[in-house]
């Protein structure tokens, strides 16, 4: 039995190839059935995200294993093998275990240390268990990878610092306000970045969010998801005074929030502080706003400096995480080898017990027929000894004939000979 990890990701293949190799959720069961129908595959998990498609397999070793699996993948997706081969990576046993642990821990992600991948790996594993998981070794490898990912998160700072603009904006807000549950947040725009910001804020228990956008329909979809109120851009001047935090990211060529607008809002708020985070390029907030007392303005460049600093911290934490992964992968493979040895030990003991029971039964039958007890016991001891040492003796003789001193020494050690 061999453990394998093979696939492509954002580092080895462009999106034009990744999208052709991806497995859609509605066809995943069919793909797993097809994969497990391959004679060499004992168990399999398919991980398919926007940045990677990977197969994790428990397989029987054979000479054409790699070619057979590449051929299956290409046939399933109607791909030319040459198109895929140069982008495909292949990891076996310890390297496969280490790769999965790195993926689950966010060490192989586009954004170093991002936590979402662990949930995606867990879902891929759960999907495989719906009648598809047949290999206990593969199941144990995934369960171990989940605990390693948790250990990496607990023992290192790999996920402690923001490395995306959206996450950095939310982190900044959490640093300035003791609790986000009591603040009002105004989000300007409804694009991808604002969507991420809104979801982060919801996770941190923000109770009141207002979304201002040029088109109400797009904003309403996001508002329904996060429980926010939708207003028009033209309503910002009137509603700005309610906001403790303003995060803006639109494609407007001109500023949406001016100095005068913020001055009026601060006056209505009796100069309670406001945090303004302008993620847009060109800027949505006039730079002069930053000169106002109690208005704390951060631009996308300010966030980038935070992100650069945090990324350096994550890279340092990744070194610690890699050490954890290497240690855990080594220990898992030692456990796997022990499991393989235990099966051999069980077979050996079963064989010896069978010989013992067979010869003991014959000896007892002879005693019941009135045979000489001493002679019967001596015969039992002689036959039992010969039967038990027969196979090791043949192995020693063969090693001697072959001049294989290394094997001779291994056999001597196994038999406890000094």
Curated annotation (Swiss-Prot):
Record keywords: NADP, Oxidoreductase, Porphyrin biosynthesis
Positions with a binding annotation for NADP(+): 189-194
One of the protein's GO biological processes: protoporphyrinogen IX biosynthetic process from glutamate
EC number: 1.2.1.70
Gene Ontology molecular functions: glutamyl-tRNA reductase activity; NADP binding
Coiled-coil ranges (or none): none
Active site: 50
Site label Important for activity, positions: 99
CDD domains in the record: NAD_bind_Glutamyl_tRNA_reduct (cd05213)
Superkingdom of the source species: Bacteria
Catalysis performed (reactions): (S)-4-amino-5-oxopentanoate + tRNA(Glu) + NADP(+) = L-glutamyl-tRNA(Glu) + NADPH + H(+)
Record pathway: Porphyrin-containing compound metabolism; protoporphyrin-IX biosynthesis; 5-aminolevulinate from L-glutamyl-tRNA(Glu): step 1/2
InterPro entries: 4pyrrol_synth_GluRdtase, 4pyrrol_synth_GluRdtase_dimer, 4pyrrol_synth_GluRdtase_N, GluRdtase_CS, GluRdtase_dimer_dom_sf, GluRdtase_N_sf, NAD(P)-bd_dom_sf, Shikm_DH/Glu-tRNA_Rdtase
Binding locations of substrate: 49-52, 109, 114-116, 120
Function as written in the Swiss-Prot or TrEMBL entry: Catalyzes the NADPH-dependent reduction of glutamyl-tRNA(Glu) to glutamate 1-semialdehyde (GSA).
Family label: Belongs to the glutamyl-tRNA reductase family.
Miscellaneous comment: During catalysis, the active site Cys acts as a nucleophile attacking the alpha-carbonyl group of tRNA-bound glutamate with the formation of a thioester intermediate between enzyme and glutamate, and the concomitant release of tRNA(Glu). The thioester intermediate is finally reduced by direct hydride transfer from NADPH, to form the product GSA.
Subunit-level organization: Homodimer.
Domain remark text: Possesses an unusual extended V-shaped dimeric structure with each monomer consisting of three distinct domains arranged along a curved 'spinal' alpha-helix. The N-terminal catalytic domain specifically recognizes the glutamate moiety of the substrate. The second domain is the NADPH-binding domain, and the third C-terminal domain is responsible for dimerization.
Annotated protein name in UniProt: Glutamyl-tRNA reductase
